[in-house]
From Swiss-Prot:
PANTHER family: D-RIBOSE PYRANASE. This is D-ribose pyranase. The gene is rbsD. Its main location: cytoplasm. GO terms for molecular function: D-ribose pyranase activity; intramolecular lyase activity; monosaccharide binding. Pathway: Carbohydrate metabolism; D-ribose degradation; D-ribose 5-phosphate from beta-D-ribopyranose: step 1/2. It catalyses: beta-D-ribopyranose = beta-D-ribofuranose. Keywords: Carbohydrate metabolism, Cytoplasm, Isomerase. Catalyzes the interconversion of beta-pyran and beta-furan forms of D-ribose. It is found in: Cytoplasm. It is an enzyme of class 5 (isomerase). Its EC number is 5.4.99.62.
């Protein structure tokens, strides 16, 4: 049995296959996923699992150099923005319109759907290197 924190086989496989500057998306239950994008659906019920819990778990195994967030999170969900910043205080943030973030999911290795039910709880993680 795997000893590390991420025990979901699909998530673990995606992370293991990522290289420098590859993208992984994590988001709320309502985020539309483009056709052809691998979707790992973890949603069980309203807010379970939460966006932040899934993000924390992924960050235990993925080196992140940059994140992409919707501009709208600044005014529509500032609490979530603050929680993200606390998890990654030294990671560059690029804000883009929500409509662009949705389109950019087509460039991700996968999108992890959570049960989160708060607006604009979506992120694209850009992988870094560990050396």
């Amino acid at each position: 049995m795997k000893k590390t924190t991420v025990i979901n086989s699909e998530i673990s496989s995606v992370i293991a296959g990522m290289g420098h500057m590859d993208w992984l998306g994590i988001g709320d239950a309502g985020m539309p996923v483009p056709l052809g994008t691998k979707k790992i659906d973890l949603a069980l019920t309203k807010n379970l699992p939460s966006f932040i819990d899934v993000l924390k778990n992924v960050l235990t195994e993925l080196e992140v150099q940059k994140i992409y967030l919707a501009d709208e999170i600044k005014t529509k969900n500032p609490e979530q923005l603050q929680a993200i910043k606390q998890l990654m205080p030294n990671v560059e943030i690029e804000f883009v319109p929500h409509s662009e973030l949705k389109k950019d999911l087509a460039k991700t290795h996968a999108f992890i759907r959570t049960g989160e039910m708060t607006a604009f709880s979506n992120i694209i993680l850009e992988s870094g290197v560990v050396f």
